[in-house]
């Protein structure tokens, strides 16, 4: 856990505060990267964590039933996003091409702040990105979204069973997943270990994010929820996990 020291997150805040980067002009911290107070000008937008969760799960139900609405894809809507963004939720998901976040939740342009990394692991860059979305874009819900058959979790399970190491940067991902496998019974089949490992890894990332001091304050104030979930490849359904 000591890898999650705040140095990189502090650097991100300095970057935002100083306006360093391509084309960034700031008047205050809430305007970083074209942000505004969340959901301004959108009276129907959900405000609470539970409202946002209901919105996402209703969208996923439409995806499962093949009744997609494809919201917020018009040229007029796109034009409203040229100066600011008001995402309603943050999704930390895997890079897997089979899990297209906006499609899975039937959301459109500007609706979701999406962070994708193989194995949905939490390193400095990911934790900083999540903090940015919560502290500056004011998203009231963070969902950690794993998926069935995750290749990164599969690699971690296979390494635990067979030994060996992968190339340096891939190994870094595996090393971050391996602690989550401690709760997974080695006597299970490989398939069942992967299935259990996916859930354990999602819960691990949820725990790490929930322990970040600034996010913990928001959770304590009941303005933020961090929710673990798994996407089922066969059905397309997002299944919420118990914390």
Kindly give the residue locations of the regions a language model identified:
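N-terminal secretory signal peptides and thylakoid transit peptides that target proteins
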Residues: 1-19
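Fold-independent oxyanion-binding glycine-rich loops
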Residues: 14, 59, 94-96, 117-118, ...
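C-terminal segment of N-terminal export signals and the immediately downstream linker at the start
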Residues: 26-65, 69-73
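Short HxH-centered metal-ligating active-site micro-motif
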Residues: 49, 99-194, 198, 204, ...
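Divalent metal-coordination and catalytic microenvironments
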Residues: 56, 91, 144, 228, ...
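N-terminal short beta-loop-beta anion/metal-coordinating cradle
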Residues: 70-110
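Internal active-site segments that recognize and position negatively charged phosphoryl groups
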Residues: 211-215, 222
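GST superfamily/GST-like fold recognition
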Residues: 220-240
């Amino acid at each position: 856990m000591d890898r999650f020291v705040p140095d990189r997150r502090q650097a991100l805040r300095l970057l935002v505060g100083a306006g360093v980067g391509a084309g960034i002009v700031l008047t205050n911290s809430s305007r970083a990267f074209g942000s505004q107070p969340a959901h301004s000008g959108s009276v129907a937008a959900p405000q609470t964590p539970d409202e946002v969760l209901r919105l996402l799960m209703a969208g996923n139900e439409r995806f499962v039933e093949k009744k997609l609405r494809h919201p917020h894809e018009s040229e007029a809507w796109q034009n409203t996003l040229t100066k600011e963004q008001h995402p309603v939720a943050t999704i930390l998901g895997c890079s897997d091409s089979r899990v297209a976040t906006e499609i899975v939740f039937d959301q459109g342009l500007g609706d979701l702040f999406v962070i994708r990394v193989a194995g949905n692991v939490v390193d400095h860059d990911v934790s900083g990105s999540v903090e940015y979305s919560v502290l500056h874009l004011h998203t009231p819900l963070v969902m950690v979204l794993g998926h069935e058959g995750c290749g990164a979790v599969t690699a971690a399970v296979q390494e635990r069973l067979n030994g060996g190491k992968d190339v340096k940067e891939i190994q870094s991902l595996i090393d971050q997943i391996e602690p989550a496998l401690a709760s997974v019974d080695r006597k299970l089949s490989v398939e069942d270990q992967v299935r259990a490992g996916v859930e354990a890894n999602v819960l691990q990332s949820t725990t790490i994010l929930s322990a970040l001091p600034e996010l913990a304050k928001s959770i304590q104030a009941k303005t933020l929820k961090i929710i673990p979930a798994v996407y089922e490849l066969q059905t397309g359904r997002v299944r919420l996990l118990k914390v």
